[in-house]
């Protein structure tokens, strides 16, 4: 079902639209969490460390797929909000075609270069074989990942956040079962974890594309259908490329931080891997909700309702802030119990590493509600330069401080770089929001 985000109470509209997206990303995170859970519990600590070590590299591919998602989604939602349905359909097919070409190039790079990258980040010898095998299988599944993300972007652009939720709920649940089957019954080791994700993402991708095709065909339009447009691809790229660069820089920064963590040994890597999975449940959820806020802003911008864009800030902060507070309480009160899901011992270096990481960063989660709401509104309004500036400042500080603090304070110094980077990025994002979107809407209201 398509939803018009340009009418109704901004708070109610955003909550109704974004909550299914929140459910979707929770199930999306089950893919990676299930891999680590099964690896840690059924194979061993080194397997957990190998999957976690590989995960930081897979984030580069996820950065490109997220960029394709947000680029297509923002442009499709803009034409949907403007009721220009024929051009909207051109945007959908152009996004899909462009994504296929990009994905093919990335598959070649991944299959040829991932092992070299594992060496570059100082992967311990005992983790190398499993890490490389996991990455090779993951790379083969990139078409499923990319096309599924574009399909999800189309759904959210049309105001439908429920359908992606249903797909992810089914495929994520199946992934857990297939993970256990391949590892416990077939004894495939880390490769079994990767093949389970490959299979379940493939089924989800095919089904989502089929539903998208039916949904887009059902939208009434007039005139000749254009399947691919270079001009449209350029519009999508204007939004997608900054998002790809932003996410890629974040991924590269995380890889640099991972290389610092790797110097402390397999147990620290395992603890960091488990804690990162938990942290990424929140970060990925907030990022996805931020893209929902972008769609809200883009539809209203297309409809000429700038004042509703400004009203979305308060609604977005309340939504994201409530989620941040829940996760802060959860990780501070039950961090050890959650980390135990990945490990077999309640004590030891691995679990203590993960617990210290969570206890250091969780109290600062609320900062992200303000930053990602502002970022989402700026991205939806096409202010990509400002959006990138806030993220890169955060990333730069995190990487530099992780290196410096680790040399002064040891491994625990690495974790301090997160709250410092978040604080600076949030301040910049709020300043940019106040001097752009907020001021424009305020001036329009007073005319």
Predicted regions and their residues:
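Hydrophobic transmembrane alpha-helices of multi-pass small-molecule transporters
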Residues: 60-63, 107, 175-180, 204-209, ...
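Helix-terminus/linker motif at the lipid-water interface of multi-pass membrane proteins
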Residues: 30-49, 118-125, 181-188, 248-277, ...
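N-terminal transmembrane alpha-helices
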Residues: 5-42, 56-71, 75, 100-107, ...
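Transmembrane helical elements of multi-pass membrane transporters/channels
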Residues: 16-35, 137, 148, 171, ...
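Short runs within selected transmembrane alpha-helices of multi-pass transporters and secretion channels
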Residues: 69, 138-156, 164-175, 193-208, ...
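Short alpha-helical transmembrane segments in multi-pass integral membrane proteins
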Residues: 1-18, 76-141, 185-241, 297-363, ...
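Transmembrane alpha-helix boundary and packing residues in multipass membrane permease domains
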Residues: 21, 25, 37, 74, ...
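Small-residue-rich hydrophobic transmembrane alpha-helices
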Residues: 48-108, 145-164, 271-335, 368-382, ...
